[in-house]
Amino acid sequence: MTDLSRRDLLAGAAGFLGGAALAGLPLAADGQGAAAPAAAGAAPAPPPPRPVAPLDATKMPGAPTAALGARSEYFAPTRIPNGTPVGSSRTPLQDLTGTITPSDLHFERHHAGIPTLDPERHTLTIHGLVDRPMSFTVDDIKRFPQITRTYFIECSGNGGAGYRDPKPDTTPQPLAGLFSTSEWTGVPLATLFREVGVKPDATWFLAEGGDACKLARSIPIAKAWDDAMIVWAQNGEPLRPAQGYPMRLLLPGFEGNSNVKWLRRLELGTKPWMTRWETSKYTDPLPDGTARIFTFEIDAKSVITSPCYPNTIPSHGWRSVNGLAWSGRGRITRVEVSVDGGTTWHDAELLNTPQPKSTVRFQYM
């Protein structure tokens, strides 16, 4: 396991540095916030009506209990969906605290919409270079010893828009919102591989999803023996359909597209399958016209979530700089923040214990 320090973090986080985030924020002479102007070329959305609260809540009974809890009417974070079956929705990072993303705000990325799968009929088949090909239902997998871990998942395209066309009126949501962190519960993939008996010459496995596009990725088998999981629960409840219900592959630190949702098949072999998802789709174009394939690990990144557009910075008093840092190559052990465009750097405080391939919340005062 590799620990990552300041230089490693900054190498992968240049587009999200503190100086860049603060430079475009206006100073408020009276210390009051300003309303957010509309994005360029878009009509301003009317503000939602403000909920009406009693003048004195101690003078009247409150709301009754309910079957499901709900957020306060005064706090209504939303994702940014594109509204098509082949699309995505982005997490409102600027509205959240801590490191865990609420399940209903976890980012989405789909290639053929969200399938409806019956957990009693859906199975995971493991075959190929194994001694005992087997199929498992979700209940079958739940019989094995389970583990719970906290990991982030990030789409490989996260941050692309911000790097290509940076704008001063960009919030963390469109800039870095294809990134979320959750507590995941499942079984180590190594446990299932031992159950089926992996043959010695198996060096790769193919993971295939059960959605309409049957997304499939080739993965080095070393990842299965390391920390890969088959998960069925997220943040204390079964996976939501958009996150792969009833089961998905979780590859900590690997690009989001390799964490195959609605997992239905694992095939073991001696070489990559060269599917269209790893040849024409998820590749890295190079200047010489060729493309790099099979890049898996997410490099160190960070994003400042507060202050951000459309916040204003008071002309007096304290204001903390708050954000998130993460890496798929180890744990974040140090974060530094610049408020002068990179001329000087200052240590930020880490607000939670760094964990491998997970997220750290930091602040600088």
PLM region spans:
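N-terminal secretory signal peptides and thylakoid transit peptides that target proteins
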Residues: 1-20
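Intrinsically disordered, low-structural-confidence terminal and linker regions
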Residues: 16, 33, 37, 46-52
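Prokaryotic Sec-type signal peptides and long signal-anchor helices
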Residues: 14, 20-21, 31, 72
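Residues at alpha-helix termini
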Residues: 22-24, 195
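Signal peptide processing junction and immediate N-terminal pro/mature segment
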Residues: 24-42
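Structured, non-membrane catalytic/scaffold regions adjacent to prosthetic-group chemistry
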Residues: 41-365
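Intrinsic disorder/low-complexity segments in short proteins, especially the signal peptide
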Residues: 15, 27-30, 98-101
